[in-house]
């Protein structure tokens, strides 16, 4: 039986065939198992010798089964590896090249310019308290921005900030002058969306406070930003304008030649000298928090600009909605320049 079983084991070409041989000989109803079960019918003096002989046969068959099973599994694995072989010398599949979003690139450029001028970069909460967004910035109750139709109000009385200026107040409450900061972040306006307006957009705002800060310092800062952003030939101009948190206030524009060779003035943002009422509001908040009043007699300037507008002008994007449409056909056009 042993020789026959081993021949059948060696002749099995698949794991299924080997399992059939195993069942035939050492399964629950196998030939060897039956022989062991019949030992009880033998005379007592013969059982021990016959049992030992059958166990030797069973062990030999099991050893042959194990060896054959290992060989068949190795062969199956080798065949699978051969069928799935990868030529590691072939070039890999190219990954699509990424690129910076136009807004990110403009922001990085501006941050780099202001860091070179010694500005610290900070961020603030997008969900803001009404006092920080309006009252502390000298925005009166009758200002249009405080209307329900122009601001996203939350049920608890807070709001989505309409500008990054609240961080001026928060920073001054926690810090004493002199300092130079720029604030970056998203702002929200409750208005209809069209080619030039979005309910959410990005701002970069600057604040400088110290002794003897003047309008000339502000103009020099804006001019330096213009040259850093648009080249050494860029020029800046200022026109009087009203903003409740600065006095005097101005709009600023940059004279720039675009990639198509067209030169014109581009309005970029607003600026001005920090209003004395803003400094007073900050000192009031500091006093309420147990801090010294340190802003009386100080001067400073602030400025703010929209990043989407700069990117639209710089890259010739006609519609602000393209920035957030997640359309790879649009953003992919800037991969070479922005990547």
Curated annotation (Swiss-Prot):
It holds the Pfam family Phe_tRNA-synt_N. Its EC number is 6.1.1.20. Mg(2+) binds at residue 247. The keyword Metal-binding applies. Keywords: Aminoacyl-tRNA synthetase, ATP-binding, Cytoplasm, Ligase, Magnesium, Metal-binding, Nucleotide-binding, Protein biosynthesis. One of its GO terms (biological process) is phenylalanyl-tRNA aminoacylation. The keyword Transmembrane does not apply. It is found in: Cytoplasm. Its cofactor is Mg(2+). One of its GO terms (cellular component) is cytoplasm. One of its GO terms (molecular function) is magnesium ion binding. It is an enzyme of class 6 (ligase). InterPro entries: aa-tRNA-synth_II, aa-tRNA-synth_II/BPL/LPL, Phe-tRNA-synth_IIc_asu, Phe-tRNA_ligase_II_N, Phe_tRNA_ligase_alpha1_bac, Phenylalanyl-tRNA_Synthase, tRNA-bd_arm. It catalyses: tRNA(Phe) + L-phenylalanine + ATP = L-phenylalanyl-tRNA(Phe) + AMP + diphosphate + H(+). Its main location: cytoplasm. Binds 2 magnesium ions per tetramer. Tetramer of two alpha and two beta subunits. NCBIfam families: pheS. Belongs to the class-II aminoacyl-tRNA synthetase family. Phe-tRNA synthetase alpha subunit type 1 subfamily. This is Phenylalanine--tRNA ligase alpha subunit. It comes from Deinococcus radiodurans (strain ATCC 13939 / DSM 20539 / JCM 16871 / CCUG 27074 / LMG 4051 / NBRC 15346 / NCIMB 9279 / VKM B-1422 / R1). The lineage of its organism: Bacteria, Thermotogati, Deinococcota, Deinococci, Deinococcales. The gene is pheS.
